[in-house]
Amino acid sequence: MGHSFTGILLGFQLNRIEIYPYGGCSKLEYDINTSLKKEILVLLMGPIIQVVFVETVKHFFIMEPYFYIYHYFILCFNLLPIYPLDGGRLLNLFLAYLFSYYNSMKTVLYISSFLYSSFFLFTLLFTKNIIYIVVVLLLGINLYKEIKQANFYFQKFLTERYLKDYSFKKTKEITELKQMRRDYYHYFITEKEIISEKEKLSLYFSYFF
């Protein structure tokens, strides 16, 4: 609920909430080119609200220990650096401060795939609990979907920059579209001249229309 509430306050549109064994997933509609700080805030409010909820319940009610174990297990699981868990999304956003959108997304998917493979193998070898195995399988399915959608997200990132006018304080000179970063306006260095981001994207999309 923390994600949904914060996202709505920041102007994001809530499409739906999906429930998984490892927690709820708020499907918020917003631009990929939204401020990194805003998106990080939305993601952080999920676990923060969960901790506040559990500690409030602990203060006012007497609950079985299982209640607290379950909630904190879900919290820790959701913070694993595996996309599309909150931990994986946060890792992607922090990488976006260092690298281009394309490279940060590719990197987090590589890291997620490696960690998930190790996690899945560990689960098969040391876990007999069928529910836990199902949870891990569901996570794998969602990760696979994100990997398949990676190129679509990159095209959406470029399309937004072409169709909408964003205001960024930072600028950067680059040579190709895959070097474009979030929170930056770009100038492209060509063999003959330096052209603006809009001009480069106009040339790029002219091949499709």
Per-range role (PLM):
Residues 1-209:
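Hydrophobic transmembrane alpha-helices and their immediate loop junctions
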